[in-house]
Curated annotation (Swiss-Prot):
Record flagged with keyword Transmembrane: yes
Its EC number(s): 2.4.-.-
Protein name: Sialyltransferase-like protein 2
Glycosylation positions in this chain: N113, N149
Pfam family, one: Glyco_transf_29
Lumenal side: 27-440
Species name: Arabidopsis thaliana (Mouse-ear cress)
GO MF, one example: glycosyltransferase activity
InterPro entries, per the entry: Glyco_trans_29, GT29-like_sf
Protein role: May be involved in the transfer of 2-keto-3-deoxy-D-lyxo-heptulosaric acid (Dha) and/or 2-keto-3-deoxy-D-manno-octulosonic acid (Kdo) on the homogalacturonan backbone of rhamnogalacturonan-II. Required for efficient pollen grain germination and pollen tube elongation. Does not possess sialyltransferase activity in vitro.
Highest taxon above the source species: Eukaryota
Mutant phenotype after disruption: Male gametophytic lethality when homozygous. May be due to defect in pollen grain germination and pollen tube growth.
Amino acid sequence: MKLLHLIFLLALTTGISAVLIYIIGVSNLYESNRFTNEDLEALQSLQNGFQKCVSANGLGLQAAMGRDYCKVSINFPKDTVPKWKDPKSGELEGLSYEFDLCEAVATWEQVRNSSTILTKEYIDALPNGWEDYAWRRINKGIQLNRCQNKSLCIEKLSLVLPETPPYFPRQFGRCAVIGNSGDLLKTKFGKEIDTYDTVLRENGAPIQNYKEYVGEKSTFRLLNRGSAKALDKVVELDEKKQEVLLVKTTIHDIMNKMIREVPIKNPVYLMLGASFGSAAKGTGLKALEFALSTCDSVDMYGFTVDPGYKEWTRYFSESRQGHTPLHGRAYYQMMECLGLIKIHSPMRADPNRVVKWVPSRSTIRSARIAAEKLLRRVGAGSADPLASCSIVKKRNKNKRPMVSHLRKPVSDHQKFVRSTSMYPVEHSPGHGQLCITPAD
């Protein structure tokens, strides 16, 4: 009887302790996620500085506060005459665009700490990664019955699927992303572009015959679906045959055949993607995404962002339909005024141009923390960089990526994230990340 009484008291005590631990844990979690007056002030400061930055640097663009401290609208002058029409509705492009600064600072900061190249460890670590995801990165992958034959899927992806990340946050110093705009022919940026540590180009944009305008250095080339199908022609654009080719869509059998038979010796990888919704589109944004995930600073050329820009042009061929040019110009101005990029164009040709009223890093950091709380992001309010990990897997000891030979900012960042590879999880509620941690 005494034994039963003792067991009852022990169970009661244990239960109370568990409840207390739960309450304390929830309380601490609530405290770290609680939106404070300081958070509100951080968003106010960001929005005020952002308005001044757009006014000072936007060449006629103006920013106005939106419905709350996250929303802003970027407005074109009333005398702007849009030319681009929606191919489906036939409606002309608008002159005012609303953006969510909270979404932007939170998402782009996550990009800065992520690997944006698809790897085998990423697919392996995803819940049902081969059955639910891998086949989507293969052209006509739906015919593969959700990769029931895993070996076949591995074979189709093998030429573009590294085991671990080939590049790391902060791996490169100064980076330039070169668009294809016809405005590049108005200013001879070539020598300036060649001074960057890393240069990223897009699709089939040529270098030969345009070197004084676009430079000749080329480190990476980002390819859309059409360009990826013509890999054999793309590699001829790089005389030194050293470009790394980044494909933003899927792998095709014709691509695999060209890589094997041409042969194409340039590394070819598939990109992962952060989730920007409908905020911005196009190869240019993906190029900036990769650059921001691997570079200390990012400058952009050839995106045609000056007044009078109403349609897509190309420096090497006839104009094409493109998509929402005014929207693109507004989005890139938002990026510059969040300190993400620096724009170079015929009207901003001075390489020493100072972008005025860019928010400080401390302002951006405080606003990001506040934004993550409002957006209910995974790990919001925590100082731990791994708090955003919604999926955590251990890495095989024999598959650890080598970073010891890379520049100091890489090793510093690796210490900060405790040698963890962090990937965006596409379409993830709360924008959680997939994290591969070192083996014990």
